[in-house]
């Protein structure tokens, strides 16, 4: 069997525990790489995070904005091979690559889409498994064929060449699962996300990038910095990203935006589209959405296409306060 066909859907209800060890092929994600003598200085002038202070064993969130502070991409940045990798949703990469390259002609830097394979290791035994394939500690580790990166306490990314990916998949002793479980964990961890449909719509703080330490307010200038700084120091940001959960009366559309409405008195008003979502087998779904940050947390929501459904805001795993 071709290794890429070994991953199957794992049907879970909203009450089922997650298996202890799972591997998935992250075809919906990819990485942009930067190599060359000017890679650090160039990227430092483009993104919200501090590239200069990023150590070999560290990973950081970051965002890349236009001049008005609207986000092209939210990514995880880490050292990979002889340069940097920016891990992000595949659908955002075409536009992000174009925008990131815009001023690169003046610098000694090569920016490209990585040909490496992205695999995701998930579950309570993920750390123990990573220890068997790496000889170092830390959140970013060099491994055979590439790099292992800790995404969260029970998740690791493997960004490796195709030959090594095949070896890992074929030797895997846990479950081979389809990538939607990675999306589920992103949602439960409220990982900031920008796919193609949400590019150039929000400033970083509306996606909670500051709450996951993806914005440095002490670094030098970068594209969109003025808006990002004003949002912090003048309080102009009125939006935040939230986890929402609710019931379904029919499958969600794969092709159209999944729009939520919020109750306003006895009426309903559009609240926006889900950035991403995951559906359980018991007609429950969870998602991420950008909403006004002064909304009452007990506000009633519903799917615009399924008005008999009810959705609610869930607690975030981190604080949005600026303290």
From Swiss-Prot:
GO biological process, one term: iron-sulfur cluster assembly
tRNA processing keyword on record: yes
Annotated keywords: Cytoplasm, Folate-binding, tRNA processing
Binding annotation for folate: 29, 182
Pfam families, per the entry: YgfZ_barrel (PF21130)
Family from the record: Belongs to the tRNA-modifying YgfZ family.
Protein name: tRNA-modifying protein YgfZ
Organism (species): Vibrio cholerae serotype O1 (strain ATCC 39541 / Classical Ogawa 395 / O395)
